[in-house]
Amino acid sequence: GKSYFSKIAGEVENPQSAGALLRSPFEFAQHGQSGMWVSEVMPHFAQCVDEVVMIRSMFTTSITHEPALFNIHSGRLFPGHPSLGAWVSYGLGSESQSLPAYVVLEDSKGPPINRNQNWQSGYLPPVCQGTRFRSTGAPVLDLHPGKDVPDQMIDLERDLIGELDRIHLGRRPHQPSLGARIANYELAARMQIEASEALDLSKESLATKAMYGIGEDKTDSYGRRCLIARRLVERGVRFVQLFIDGQIWDNHTSLKSGLQGAC
């Protein structure tokens, strides 16, 4: 994650250096009615600090990427435990019959460290895990049949597969992953229209797109995913998670220029 000391905290005392000050390269000022300290590198965030909740009590006992990502998603340092989105999906379900309860929007530049283990369901039913959507092009790969296949043939094929699935599941009642897989296929059929509509930003106004930074080189990709996330929530998705380019905050060197470029 981004450096807390260079973005939010201001000057702090380093207990490892016998009282010496570890100063951020950025200047800080208080903002909003809350008086939250925010550095100069986040001018837009500084304007809306009273609209966010700042959690200052979080910490990790790991210094490496993989366990830290497991920790922030599931509260544990190792894989195999449900992610936060999976718990929300398990507890609340989905308000939509045509969209998953938990959707993941990855960065177009590539998946995050740990990949799909970040949104796993662990020991909860597999249906609670995140469903990955793409923010450009087809939201879900291979969701639509070939153009030359008649609709009537698609319906007959779907009914036949559904009947075979029910027979197969009846012979294996103690395999929850099988039931989840069948449910995912049924959901995929319903998603063919709903998912494409949710990711279609063409009907959004120019003013709305501008608010999300769509059309600007540095903000277009993430802004599109933010707007898509809002549209998914409006359509009943309970939990939407956005990932950003790989290790953009991994500033081992060139802290000042690295953070400024990332922000």
Which sequence ranges carry the predicted segments?
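Ligand-binding pockets and gating/stacking loops
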Residues: 1-263
